[in-house]
Every structure is written in C-alpha cells, then in structure tokens.
Amino acid sequence: MKHKFTILSAILIVALTACCLFACNDKGDSPAKVDYQSDNSYFVKTAESETALTFEPILDPVYSESGLTYKQVDYRFGVIFYVGTAIEPKYYEYLGNALAKQGYLVVMPKVTLNMTYAYYKAQEEAFSAYPNVKFFVAGHSQGGGAALRRASENADTVAGAILLSPLCYRHKLLDADGNPVKDEESGVDKYIIDNLKDVDVATLLVEAEQDHVLSDEMKADAKTRLKEGYVHKVISPAAHMSFSTMDNDEILKSFNNDGDGITEAQKQSQRTKTVEYILNFVKGLSN
C-alpha cells in the first residue's frame, strides 16, 4: 500500500511539474502587450520584401547560427507611410525605427518609380496583411497626398492621418470596373478632389517653414481639404525634402536655384521634431 502511494505521489508530482512548465512556457511565448502611453524601447526588426519595407517592434532578440529568435510584441497600432516623389523608403528609416521602438508596426509600401500617388492602389495591402492592427496613414509630399486620399476612402478603417508637407492632387472618378466616369453632358472625365472635411479622421499636418518645393497656393490648397480642428505644426528652419534623409541638394536645385539653404544640423533637428510631433499625435489616439 505504501509502495502504491509512493508511485501515485511521484506521478502527481511529475504531472504538476509538467503543467507548471507548460503554463510558464505558454506565458513566455504569448506576445507582450504594448502600453502606448509609456516611453517604450522595443528592439526593431527591419524586413524588406518586393512590396514594402517593414519595421516591427520585438523583444529579447537572440542572434545565432540558426538565425534570429525573439519574443513577439502584440502591437495593436501601426503606421502606413507613403514615400515622397522619387524617394526610396530607406530614406525614412529614422522615422520607421523611432515609431517601431515605441510599439508601432510601420509599413512603407514600395511603388513604381517611388511615385506613390501616380501608382496609387485601390486596396492597401497592409490592411489585409495585418487585420488586427489599426493603422494611421501617413506620407510625405506626394505620399502625403496619397495618405489624404487613403484616409478619405477608408475613413472607417484608419486611426488617423499624418501629412508631412503634402502635395495634393485630384484624380479621375472610376466606376466599379475601374473605368473613368464621364460627365453626361460634356462627355469629359469626372474628377474627385480628395478631402477630409466631411469625415471624422483625426489629422496631423506638419509643414516646413523654408519649403521651396510647394508653392503658397499648394500649401493653402492642402489646408482647404482638412476638417476644422486638425493639429497643425510648422517646423523652422526646415526644408521640404528634409523630412527624408536623402542627399537632396541636386534635387532641390531643380526646383529652385539655391536649394533650401538648410544646414545638416537643422535637417537633423527637423527630423527629431517630426518624430516628436508624430509620436505625441499617435499616442494620444492609441487607446
């Protein structure tokens, strides 16, 4: 009898130990929750595919011969960032890293010739790729115009819009088959002017004081497309192209003779303030 009791006790101890180990491992493997109101410091995993450059927050990365292992993060919010005209996503890495460090998944879609608005896609792939993530849509220059358009077309889906010196356009009205809709009387293609005036989308507009790329008319036009109460920040000194880290002097000279006249230190300060303004904006809406 005593022998049977000893065996039963041993079996019970083994079973309890196994359950405990399973519970511990299960807890360890479950994604870490993000407190978006805290000043976080996640590691950032950068991945590049044919369609996007992605910045993912992770924990406890371990590099070995077999590759990278890490603890997953349960990020509930993200930022889709559309690039400026002819600027590759890699030139916005500073922004992707800063946002991912705070717990946001950042996706920078790749488009033909880096012309986001010209090659605008009717469906945003990140929405279906990450169905559990609530995305802010953001962009710079032409990409800002694309972000405004995305926000207007997907107002019920996005968490907010972030526009960095946006270059806004109008585009053709298309039918369900993707064909241009024509005016019944004139036969001319109908156009849509994207705007957020009549939709409930929180919006941040950040402008560069020394912007020699956008005209005053272009800047004014962007503001007319926004709903009253949007958050507006102006950085000075700051240049249009310096929201990216691309060496831009030659590009700027094609728009104006002397470039923007902004020093490297001032460009870095502009980008630091850009990160600060965006984080303050998204953290206030990440509930």
Which ranges hold each PLM region?
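Short alpha-helix in the alpha/beta-hydrolase fold that links the catalytic acid
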Residues: L95, V201, L214-T224, D247
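Short beta-strand/loop motif that positions the catalytic acidic residue
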Residues: V199, L205-E207
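C-terminal motif of bacterial Sec signal peptides marking the signal peptidase cleavage site
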Residues: C19-A23
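Gly/Ala-rich beta-loop-alpha elbow adjacent to hydrolase catalytic centers
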Residues: A138-A147
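Active-site nucleophile loop of the alpha/beta-hydrolase fold
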Residues: V111, I162-H171, A208-Q210, P237
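N-terminal cap/lid segment of alpha/beta-hydrolase-fold proteins
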Residues: K27-D74
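Short beta-strand element of the alpha/beta-hydrolase
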Residues: Y75-G84
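Conserved alpha/beta-hydrolase
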Residues: G96-T116
